[in-house]
């Protein structure tokens, strides 16, 4: 950090602001400010403290501590914070494999309530669904297994959502656009590695109390982070408690047409209102013991997340056109659910001469339960339901993993003396990493479905089991050929065996697959002392089918009774044990220019050639759970595909580009995507759910002479049309999300932040059209979006 004092004239308005700041600071801290000195005042809540090395001695408390500066004096000091962002950019610049690093300062900037809200502003990241209702993050517009999400280098369990993590728990986020042997090759679109906060010797005790307001609902939350050290032990503990409340509404219009004549045979309109309440708690920690002065460290990492939800939905169905009356006119449903996820990881690092051994093992388990009752009524039947569906499910999964990694430095610097290449390696030295990963998991699902008291799906039993075992071996070498060139080469082999109950109730099938993935990354600097560099990556990656797609028990569409038929746009769902993994050959080419004070300009081109593409296909089948044929959606390998794109990013301070401009921090990125699925007619035969583009432009500025910081961001994703097959077409609407925040720093220990998300809400309308057997069915789904406000008080206790 660079602190440059600059006296300013003191006005009456300034004195009033400082008096208010002093009063609130005294009330919240008991009058005991913790400033170290007049010059080196602590950073405001928006700028996190920089961690100290674990082995660094903690400075002793002086007998006569320096008296804190008065607010009037402190306000006259000009504080310039450049270290945080420069550190993130330096990590990015020194990485041989292309990597974007987002640190604490950037994560904290907007004061988001969940990590998912932070991710959607990052370069190349999109989220499906309406604003504020999105699902898991996607890189390059590709989700559903194309984007690998890691937490501390470990894959997240099925059913886990990044929405369950708070920004206070995260130290940094790394986005790897191409896979590496160490992080894994199940990353065709890339990898998002979420690094949780580590323990360091500077004491922290932060409390953040906030409330969210949306569509007439209130959602409070509390987050607490504590960090300290005792002797050889450093630890960090983060906890949060939240209560979420959302109200949604939607309209679904379904129209059946005769393809030949164009006549409308049936039209139905369903309107629904949903009230969802969720309460949860999240606790995570990291405890590190330094076992010796040689760098031996033992780290324990427990995490626990628990949430309960209550969802109530009312709906009505009208049929303006149609000869056969609908099955119901109105109805309601109530779902009571809970999810608990716990994990315990143990990591041991030991120096072995010139090598470092790292052993990492963990056990984890998650439990989920859900109980739903749906009742349907007709006008003629009055208050007596014509159909009642009671569905209960209990799912549990246990997992265990053991990883070993050995890092070794080989070779020696040239005789002329050591020099550093473009990456982290010293010229002439090799950073060799070898590792092994073993993971085993077992899932058990118990489910019962009653329709008017009669059990459904009796052929499949109440209990379904599946297990999966994964073994991976890898080796990678990073070395600098000379001050201009650095190379990162790796080879990874991974095998997965899955066994479980089949979707059709037959004997337990087994699915085995293994993949060898060579990976090569290179970086070249035209001038060893310059700020420009060029990156090239040649990779092989893959996407494995998950347990749900392989072994899933049939899921009956609740809108259509099992005794009758359903429609192509409302199919039942089942698994396919014969799926093969998708394979992809990829190339990435990037040009980067690093600016002063942590700025960066970059352009990246990428291409992925995919073989054995997996896609959900809907067909009319004879099924065991119904006396008539029903439409069933199963995931199938349908052929090959190609996706390409360009990604642009610019991050800089405005006064460094325009003389005399204010010190505004600017951030912008633009990504353009194009894809083509072979065997599917064009022109919109793109990969499922891949948008044409995504863009962000944002800025933040601390108003000089005031404790006020303002910032904003605009996220844009255009609408697009997707030809899924010869018969099916979907359209996805565009999104334009405006966010803005204001931070008032009352004192170094107190801040008040206000965030507005989706300031210009728009309706979200998607369509799904399927044409089979001379009949065209089109479904139009519309749901409004809402502005969300967050108000949060940030305290450094």
Map each language-model feature to its residues.
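Short acidic/polar hinge/loop motifs at secondary-structure boundaries
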Residues: 138, 154-180, 224
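Outer membrane beta-barrel strand-and-loop segments of large Gram-negative receptors
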Residues: 390, 399-405, 576, 580, ...
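Face-selective signature of the C-terminal outer-membrane beta-barrel domain
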Residues: 284-307, 334-502, 525, 529, ...
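Gram-negative outer-membrane beta-barrel transporters
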Residues: 487, 602, 606-610, 628-720, ...
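Extracytoplasmic beta-strand/coil segments of soluble accessory domains associated
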Residues: 99, 116-154
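N-terminal periplasmic accessory domains that precede
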Residues: 115-118, 135-138, 175, 187-209, ...
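N-terminal periplasmic "start-of-domain" segments of outer-membrane beta-barrel proteins
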Residues: 77-110, 136-138, 144-147, 200
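C-terminal beta-signal and adjacent terminal beta-strands/loops
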Residues: 4, 716-722, 743-797
């Amino acid at each position: 950090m660079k602190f440059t004092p600059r006296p300013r004239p003191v006005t009456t308005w300034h004195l009033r602001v400082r008096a208010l700041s002093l009063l609130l600071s005294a009330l919240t801290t008991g009058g005991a400010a913790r400033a170290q000195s007049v010059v080196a005042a602590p950073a405001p809540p928006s700028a996190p403290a920089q961690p100290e090395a674990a082995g660094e001695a903690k400075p002793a408390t002086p007998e006569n501590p320096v008296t804190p500066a008065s607010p009037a004096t402190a306000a006259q000091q000009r504080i310039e914070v450049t270290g945080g962002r420069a550190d993130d950019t330096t990590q990015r610049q020194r990485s041989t494999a292309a990597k974007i690093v987002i640190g604490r300062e950037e994560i904290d900037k907007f004061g988001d309530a969940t990590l998912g809200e932070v991710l959607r502003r990052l370069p190349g990241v999109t989220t499906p669904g309406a604003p504020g209702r999105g699902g898991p993050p996607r890189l390059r517009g590709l989700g559903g297994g194309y984007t690998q999400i890691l937490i501390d280098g470990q894959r997240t369990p099925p059913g886990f959502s990044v929405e369950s993590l708070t920004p206070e728990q995260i130290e940094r986020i790394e986005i790897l656009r191409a896979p590496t042997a160490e992080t894994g090759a199940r990353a065709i679109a890339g990898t998002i590695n979420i690094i949780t906060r580590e323990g360091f010797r500077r004491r922290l005790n932060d409390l953040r109390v906030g409330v969210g307001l949306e569509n007439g609902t209130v959602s409070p939350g509390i987050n607490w982070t504590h960090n300290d050290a005792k002797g050889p032990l450093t630890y960090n503990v983060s906890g949060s408690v939240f209560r979420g409340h959302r109200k949604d509404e939607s309209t679904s219009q379904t129209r059946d047409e005769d393809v030949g004549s164009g006549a409308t045979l049936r039209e139905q309109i369903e309107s629904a209102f949903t009230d969802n309440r969720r309460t949860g708690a999240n606790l995570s920690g990291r405890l590190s013991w330094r076992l010796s002065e040689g760098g031996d460290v033992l780290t324990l990492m427990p995490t626990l997340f628990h949430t309960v939800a209550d969802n109530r939905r009312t709906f009505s169905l009208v049929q303006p056109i149609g000869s056969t009356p609908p099955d119901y006119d109105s109805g309601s449903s109530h779902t009571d659910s809970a999810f608990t996820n716990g994990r315990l990881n143990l990591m041991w690092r030991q120096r072995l001469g010139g090598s470092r051994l790292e052993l990492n093992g963990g056990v984890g388990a998650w439990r989920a339960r859900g109980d739903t009752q749906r009742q349907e009524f007709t006008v003629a039947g009055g208050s007596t339901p014509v159909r009642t569906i009671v569905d209960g499910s209990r799912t549990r999964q246990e997992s265990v993993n053991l990883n070993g990694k050995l890092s070794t430095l080989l070779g020696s610097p040239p005789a002329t003396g050591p020099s550093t290449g473009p990456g982290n390696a010293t010229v002439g030295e090799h950073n060799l990493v070898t590792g092994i990963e073993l993971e085993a998991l077992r899932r058990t699902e118990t489910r019962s479905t009653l329709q008017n008291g009669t059990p459904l799906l009796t052929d499949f039993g109440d209990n379904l089991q599946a297990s999966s075992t994964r073994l991976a071996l890898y080796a990678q070498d990073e070395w600098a050929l000379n001050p201009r060139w650095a190379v990162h080469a790796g080879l990874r082999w991974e095998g997965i065996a899955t066994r479980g109950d089949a979707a059709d109730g037959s004997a337990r099938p087994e699915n085995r697959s293994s993949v060898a993935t060579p990976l090569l990354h290179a970086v070249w600097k035209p001038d060893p002392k310059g700020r420009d560099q060029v990156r090239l990556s040649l990779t092989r990656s893959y996407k494995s089918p998950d347990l749900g797609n392989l072994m899933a028990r049939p899921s009956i569409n609740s809108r259509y009774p099992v005794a009758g038929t359903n429609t192509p746009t409302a199919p039942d769902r089942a698994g396919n044990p014969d799926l093969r993994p998708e394979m992809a050959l990829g190339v990435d080419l990037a040009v980067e220019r690093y600016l002063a004070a942590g700025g960066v300009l970059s352009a990246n081109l990428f291409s992925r050639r995919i073989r054995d593409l997996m896609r959900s296909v809907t067909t009319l089948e004879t099924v065991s759970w119904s006396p008539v044929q029903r439409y069933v959606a199963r995931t199938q390998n349908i052929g090959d595909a190609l996706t390409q794109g360009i990604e642009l990013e610019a991050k800089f301070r405005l006064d460094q580009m325009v003389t005399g401009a204010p010190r505004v921090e600017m951030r912008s990125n633009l990504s353009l995507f194009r894809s083509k699925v072979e065997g599917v007619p064009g022109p919109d035969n793109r990969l499922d759910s891949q948008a044409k583009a995504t863009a962000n432009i944002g800025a933040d500025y601390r108003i000089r002479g005031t404790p006020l910081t303002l910032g904003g961001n605009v996220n844009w994703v255009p609408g697009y049309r997707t030809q899924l097959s010869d018969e099916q077409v979907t359209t996805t609407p565009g999104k334009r999300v405006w966010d803005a925040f204001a931070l008032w720093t009352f004192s170094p220990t107190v801040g008040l932040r206000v965030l507005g998300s989706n300031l210009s809400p728009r309706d979200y309308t998607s369509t799904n059209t399927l044409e089979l057997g001379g009949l065209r069915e089109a479904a139009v789904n519309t749901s409004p979006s809402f502005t969300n406000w967050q108000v949060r008080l940030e305290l450094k206790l």
